[in-house]
Each structure stands twice: as C-alpha cells, then as structure tokens.
Amino acid sequence: MNTRLRNLTITSQAFGFGVKYPEPTTLDQIYEKGARVLKAVVFDMDETLLSINLNAFILRYFKDVSSMLADIGHRSRGGTMARLGTILVDLNANRRSGTDNRTNLEFYQEEVERRCGICLSDPLIYEAFTYYDREVLPYKNDDVINAHAMPGAHAALQAVQDAGLRCALFTNPSFPQGAIECPMGWGDLADAPFELVTHMGNTTRCKPDATYYLEQLQVMGLEPHEVLMVGNDPKRDFPSPDCGIQTAFVGQGKPSRATWRGTMEDFARDFDAVIEAFYEHQVANELS
C-alpha cells in the first residue's frame, strides 16, 4: 500500500467495511516510481539574484581593461578595445573545438597574447589586473550600473537553505574570479551559502553550452535530474543541448522549457510550489 496516501475514508457496505483511498497525486506517482530527489538549486546572478544594468557594467569593465592593456602594450585604446571585443564574443560563443579543454581564463589569456601581443599570465601584469578587480572595480557601482540585491533574492536563498538543499552560483563565466566576486558584494551575496561560484578560472565553456553545466555538476557530485537552475535569460539559463536540468524562469517572457515562471519574490514566497512543479515536470517526462 502506498504509505503516502492519507485521509482514508471508511464507508459501510452490506458486508463489513470498505476502505476508499483518494486518487494518487502526481507526487504520489513519482514517489512510487522511485523519486529522483531534488538535491540542489543553482542560481544565475545578473538580473536573477542581482539587479544590475549589465550592459553598463560590461562597458565600464572592458573599457577600463582595454585601456590598461593598451597602456601596457603601447597600443591605441580604440584598436585594443576592438580586438578585446572580438575575443569576448568568441569566448561567449564557445568558438573552439570540442576537444579544447582549456579553461575560459586560459583561452582568454592566450587569445589576448595572440591578438594584442600582451602576456596576461606574466606575474606582474596578472597582478595589475587582479588588483583592479579587487581594489578598483568595487568602487565603480554608480547610478548608471545601479547594482543591488534583486527583491526576493535573499529570501529565496533562505528558502533553499531551510529546505536542506545545496546551493551554487552558476553565473556566466565570462569574467575573472575577482570581477565575479565584485558584483556579488554589491548584492550582499559574498556570504551566501554557495558551494561553488563559476568564473573564468574554473570553467571551460560559457552558457548555454551543456558542457558548462555538466562540468560543474560533476564537481558537485550531482546528476542533472537532481538540480534546479534558476535564471532570467531565456537562452543562457537553459542548457543547450538539453541535458536534463530543469529551469525555474524569473525573467521576461514564457519559455516553453521553463518548469516554473515568476519573479524572485514569487520564487521565495511560493518555494513549495516550485518544488512541486519540479517533481510534476519530472513525472511528466517519466510518463511521456
């Protein structure tokens, strides 16, 4: 007998008593089949946990970085910024062979050296950019970038923690570690209970490549069906090709692949409903 069934109603019959069980729910079905239990929730950062004018931040960051590169390499700032832009486009588009296992940071550094003639791995040069990320960039948040915690973000993290689930930050890894940790600070996320934060140095692909997601799950010892991704980007926050990771969508629009849709405040307030949607989606796939 299914031990999850509750509220039995007993009806008298001509001979003895009969027990009437309620119809099994979607969750009852998946528990009977052997639930693939949700173990972790992984979040995007920009416009998910962090409200930010991302275009303004990117422009500010890479304008400063390209100026530093130009000064170091004694090149024009305009030309250096253009070359750096093509490198970043290639990085984000994952334009490299499937057998290229360099980290995103190694790809970035080697392409800067090849196209701009500047060795970013040189200890003195590396230290200069690390200093910028950690000591200068934190003061760049202004009325234009306007970075702050997304309403509902901290409550969402608390809901995940209260549910006993693991948590990680799966932000697009097109920045070095220091430039990821900086906006985390703007959103008061530095002390969040993330087991893992993705950045250039610990990834080999960018979103939405499924390789990016699967590599990080391997580090965490998780399977795709044990994880819920939370993000706002209808392209980047849905692994391509589909690898079995479900996504709760907190952006604009109605992506057909979304397991659940709403705001971060909705996510925090209705987290039980989010979990139920996760299992309903899972059993629907099992039964299809």
Tell me the role of every PLM-derived stretch.
Residues L54-F57, Y61, A149, A179-C182, ...:
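Residues at alpha-helix caps and immediate loop-helix transition turns in enzyme cores, especially N-
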Residues T86-V136:
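A metal-dependent, Asp-based hydrolase signature
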Residues R102-T103, L137-A168:
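Short, acidic loop-to-helix structural element flanking the phosphoryl-transfer center
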Residues T48-L54, A93-S97, R166-A168:
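A ubiquitous short alpha-helical element
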Residues G18-Y21, T25-G85:
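Active-site neighborhood of HAD-like aspartate-dependent phosphohydrolases
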Residues M1-V41, Q158-Q161, F170, S174-F175, ...:
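Asp-based, Mg2+/Mn2+-dependent phosphohydrolase catalytic module
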Residues A70-T86, R114-T130, A190-L196, H225:
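Short, surface-exposed acidic
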